[in-house]
């Protein structure tokens, strides 16, 4: 366990290597997070003209959670926090934020870009390992662009349902799960874009009720 600025970075469950990475560009992103203040990220994005840098550092990403009705007291668990693209939106409204991510490099990027925050803790490791050590109950648990990877990290016959069952154990009685995932009829497809993982049009989840 160590600190980057005020942020606690807990590597108790980290297995020593990053299994999910964008490659060498992450070294460049780490240098940006270390040496560039967030108010200058847009300038760097314009200069670099790099999709990963735009994707991970654009403040527009935070809009996906800007609607959440925070009062400043909530405890939030962000699963799959990556480089912290939406962590700032949570820190801006909630009382405490705990992040979980599989990648040490991405967690370091997240910690450096939010190093002034005194209410952020980042737990590095596979969710199935980390969640066994969670002692808190949360008002909100977020899965932003993460739920579709459940099959890769939840070892069971029905990984997506079991993923939700595991998460529910860590909610307060009136807590809520917030999921953002590709919508097969989303505006991006009507604009001609393809799905990120398969490269096809109109690919994604259909709205349905899952009993957990």
Predicted regions and their residues:
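N-terminal auxiliary segments of SAM/dcSAM-dependent transferases
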Residues: 1-36
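Conserved class I S-adenosyl-L-methionine
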Residues: 73-82, 178-201
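Conserved SAM-binding loop of SAM-dependent methyltransferases across substrates and taxa
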Residues: 83-94
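Class I SAM-dependent methyltransferase SAM/SAH-binding core
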Residues: 93-129
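A short acidic, Gly/Pro-enriched loop at the edge of an enzyme's catalytic core
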Residues: 132-141
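A short glycine-rich, Lys/Arg-flanked "PGG" loop and its adjoining helix->strand segment in the class I
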Residues: 158-176
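Conserved small/polar residues in nucleotide/adenosyl-binding loops
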Residues: 210-212
């Amino acid at each position: 366990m160590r600190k980057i600025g005020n942020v606690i970075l807990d590597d108790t469950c980290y297995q020593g290597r990053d299994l999910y990475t964008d490659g060498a560009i992450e070294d460049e992103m780490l240098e940006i997070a270390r040496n560039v203040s967030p108010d200058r990220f847009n300038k760097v994005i314009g200069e670099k003209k790099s999709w990963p840098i735009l994707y991970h550092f654009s403040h527009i990403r935070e809009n996906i959670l800007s609607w959440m009705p925070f009062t400043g007291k909530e405890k939030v668990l962000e699963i799959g926090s990556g480089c912290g693209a939406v962590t700032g939106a949570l820190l801006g409204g909630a009382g405490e934020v705990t992040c979980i991510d599989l990648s040490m490099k991405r967690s370091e990027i997240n910690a450096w870009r939010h190093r002034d925050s005194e209410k952020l803790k980042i737990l590095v490791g596979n969710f199935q390992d980390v969640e066994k050590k969670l002692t808190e109950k949360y008002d909100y648990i977020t899965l932003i662009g993460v739920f579709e990877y459940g099959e890769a990290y939840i070892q069971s016959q029905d990984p997506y349902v079991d993923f939700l069952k595991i998460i529910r154990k860590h909610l307060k009685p009136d807590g809520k799960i917030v999921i953002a995932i590709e919508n097969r009829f989303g505006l991006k497809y009507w604009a001609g874009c393809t799905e990120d993982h398969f490269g096809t049009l109109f690919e994604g989840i259909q709205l349905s009720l899952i009993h957990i």
